[in-house]
Amino acid sequence: IKSVLDAVKKHAKHIIVVDDGSKDGTADIVRKCKGVTLLQHKRNLGKGSAVRSGCDFAVKQGANILVLMDSDGQHDARNIPRFIKTMKDVDVVFGYRTERSQMPLLYKFGNWFLTMYTFLLFGSRIKDTQGGFRSMTSDAYKKIRWHATRYEMETEMIAHAAEHKLKYRQIPIKTIYHDAYKGTSVSDGFKICWHMLKWRLGL
């Protein structure tokens, strides 16, 4: 994570890392990084909970624009200025992955299906519904603040953005794959579809 933070520091002044109950020494590494705020969950609550904690804290600190990115090194921090620049006149910016050659066929199909499913339910033509590299205004966050605790958070954001008719743009991003592809599991995909249907029906 240190290399990720070193890269982010070149493009952002205020950095928040949420340690979601990890036991691999991540928190100790982050504490040694100057200019980085560390938030910790005592136990693992899931990605949705971790990102929500970070966003809540940022908004309370007076942030106007929030940029979300994963800490595993797959997101290139050099894209941060592009996200901020693209925020002009819109509420949310979604990044979509252009390089998916290392993604197994099953995951490619799953992403395509979720994209079509999202369009059918909410009318949103989001090219990468599970991409985690995104940005939004603090006002937009207050409207789309999600309840999901895990990977379905990305799709809930889209659902709420459609519900509130928020303006959005999409920009292509290159994903840096360091190891075998890791993504949303098949079981997570089914859970996401179920949650999407409930959001659409207002359940």
Question: Predicted segments — roles?
Answer:
Residues I1-H11:
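Short, well-formed alpha-helical segments that are part of the catalytic scaffolds
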Residues K2-S3, D24-K32, R78:
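Acidic helix N-cap motif at the loop->helix transition within catalytic regions
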Residues K13, V36-T37:
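Short, conserved active-site loop motifs that form the nucleotide-linked donor/cofactor pocket
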Residues K13-I15, I65, K167:
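Residues at the starts of beta-strands that form the adenosine-phosphate
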Residues D19-A27, G73:
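A conserved acidic beta->alpha catalytic loop
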Residues T37, H41-K60, A77-Y151, Y177-S187, ...:
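Acceptor/aglycone-binding surface of glycosyltransferases and processive sugar-polymer synthases
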Residues A63-D72:
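Short beta-strand-to-loop acidic/aromatic patch adjacent to the donor-nucleotide binding site
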Residues R125, T149, I158-I176:
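Catalytic donor-sugar/metal-binding loop of nucleotide-sugar-dependent glycosyltransferases
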